[in-house]
């Protein structure tokens, strides 16, 4: 029945050939075309920007600086250097070799990566070449030889885990494999001459002399890690947008903006925004911890994550509070979508792998939020709080100042709209009184009703001309 009623002619609607459409069809067509055009341009520009952040990304992997320290000082260290020379290129991290005097211990190498001086590090173990030479001779040295006690590589697994595992860890594992080949090329003849061929363990040591050992800072293997700097940046922004739209609607419906003083409105909105940002940050921290699996984060990490997310949430509240006060509602989606894409683009990939143009994203709050979270989750490593926290608080202070002007604009606009609505009703009442005085004295209510129905019927009928017979 519903489908049939859709095709039945309506008796109380304006016909498409009615004079109502005169001058409106062209305007409707132009407005519709402009809306479609602007939406296409919006998505083209924003998605081009987002895709541009990772455009030709593998060719910039060489910007990952990896510390190389040779504690061995023998043929295994030479093998690692030889392997790097074979693999060196734009798609491979750059090994920066430093002397043992600069990094005298393995812990000092680890701390260099932790500080963020390097994205990773590779070091050979002390006396690794001597142990291998002794193993080739057979005996107890061969049976106890461990190829994993030759090379160790380090990286901070919390920092951009998808890129770190794909372009850093995998390449360092490959480096160790090529180092074995380089060892056979450099020392294969000498090793074969000293090999005890009757000892199976010695032969095994020659066939598999080198194996890399991974020593990541804060292993981050949970599947949800891919969301932390992608979808995780979108959710806080959307939550605050929905909150602002909701509180705007409630304030308008309850006539708070037009009836209450500005200061009262400001206190109410500020209090509600702080409470919602606090609870929303708790929700986000909660579902992050709920799916952390075996991730070794602590209770203090939970509290710090909650607090920095609270700050980020409130920054986004200020952003939408300001936009919705000064920008017409039909244009708000354009700004919301653009703000989301810009923030996600700033955090989705390390700037070492993006074109230099995108580094202006250091000024965006999402980038600084993710840097602070990396520091929290990696037990203080990759500490860029000296840059990130001042930028975040600058956004918050700017928003606090802007919220004063947005509240003034919001209250003034509500008062102005109320006065215009009041004036409109007054004009309608005055016009109605004038029409009542102009009606003939003996006109009955029934006659007026018949005339109204007749005029209404004529206005809805198609405007056609009938030929006289």
Where is each model-derived feature located?
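Short, functional N-terminal and low-complexity linear motifs
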Residues: 13-19, 32-33, 45-51, 252-256, ...
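Extracytoplasmic/periplasmic domains immediately adjacent to an N-terminal transmembrane anchor
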Residues: 2-223, 420-469
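Membrane-spanning alpha-helical segments of multipass transporters and channels
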Residues: 222-243, 247, 254-440
